[in-house]
Amino acid sequence: AAINDIIVPLMTEKHHSVNHVFAAHPELLPMSKSTFYKYIDLGILNVKNIDLQRKVRYRVKKEYDYTRAKTKDNGIKLGRFYRDFQDFLEHNPNASIVEMDTVIGTQGGKGGKCFLTLLFRFFNLMVIKVLPYRRSIHVTEVFEKLKESLGDEEFSRLFQIIITDNGSEFSDPESIEISTKTGEKLSSVFYCDPNSSWQKGCIEKNHQYIRYILPKGTSFAGISQQDADVIASHINSTPRLVLNNQSPYEAAIGFIGKDSMDLLGIQRIDNDDVDLSIRILNR
């Protein structure tokens, strides 16, 4: 009865995963996860397979042939290819890695409001910034604000390495890397090989959490930065199996620190208050 009364609503209404409810309520689930799934299949619980968070599969891509790199890549991307990223990591194995991407709403291309996502790879912690358009000037504006609020030293510590794709919105890496105050290089931007999104697979997988709240086809037109911070806070408060059932917030707080976490717009949400549905934007 307790499972149907407490656990099932968390899964069907707030989109909690099986791992999330097992991490948050072990006292109510005296069985293995495989048994829990079996109970669902047998119809013992008031939850159906369609209510479960989807599992995402990724294909392994073949290695990129750098000898075929387009001439235009040899400008801004010289020294920033994925192989350069790998070389940098060999010499800086403990560097903080941030994966960067964009998520669009109903309007594709550069035509409307979208999200800039920044994911701290070691912790699966995702920052979400609202862009009015998917253009490099607006990406630059986000990073100028981050440098201003965090300060150059803290920005450099947190964003030591940034790995992203070949989208035109990321075509001005120096504006991301360089301090607007001193001209000093604070970060290093690298690019994935073409058609190799798996090289920043952590952020690709984390985007599924955004889609639980804002399914594909949902307009971002009415989404404010405050809304994006709320979305990020709920996502980052969701326990992850890969983090030994810690949430990204719990895993990252020791490294990022409370002050910087606040400046990044992320707050901790209690386990049972985590809601991965659009209702969180109507509160």
Regions found by a protein language model. Give the residues of each.
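Secondary-structure boundary/capping micro-motif
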Residues: 1-205, 209-219, 223-224, 230-233, ...
